[in-house]
From Swiss-Prot:
Gene name of the encoded protein: H3-7
Name this protein carries in UniProt: Histone H3-7
SUPFAM superfamilies: Histone-fold
Residues with 5-glutamyl dopamine modification: Q6
Residues bearing the modification Phosphoserine: S11, S29, S58, S87
Length: 136
């Protein structure tokens, strides 16, 4: 075979374009033709951490006032009928109840962390109440 002289050709600047797969082409064309955009979602745990920071900063009561007041009156009915409550008495009960629950959940969280978990479970609450001596 005889040798031939090679002439220099102009470079096109890279590789030749490849054919796209059918799925990729369909995915790229879908939003352009009016596909429905997904609503924005935060990663799991982000909103939870934001809520923790928000509620730790705040001082307002978290249990609604009227449902708590109805519960207090319902429990009081079992002991004596026709009891009246000052609004400040119901507020004091609510403050005490919320403080108790916050402390309970703090200790419950510590029990879950001790068990190398991040999720609190009923057994954590039971352990806390046994350690505190509230329930034998």
């Amino acid at each position: 075979m005889a040798r031939t002289k090679q002439t220099a050709r102009k470079s096109t600047g890279g590789k030749a374009p490849r054919k796209q797969l059918a799925t990729k082409a369909a995915r790229k064309s879908a939003p352009a033709t009016g596909g429905v955009k997904k609503p924005h979602r935060y990663r799991p745990g982000t909103v939870a951490l934001r809520e923790i920071r928000r509620y730790q900063k705040s001082t307002e009561l978290l249990i609604r006032k009227l449902p708590f007041q109805r519960l207090v009156r319902e429990i009081a009915q079992e002991f004596k009928t026709d009891l009246r409550f000052q609004s400040s008495a119901v507020m004091a009960l609510q403050e005490a109840r919320e403080a108790y629950l916050v402390g309970l959940f703090e200790d419950t969280n510590l029990c879950a962390i001790h068990a190398k978990r991040v999720t609190i479970m009923p057994k954590d609450i039971q352990l806390v109440s046994r350690i505190r001596g509230e329930r034998a």
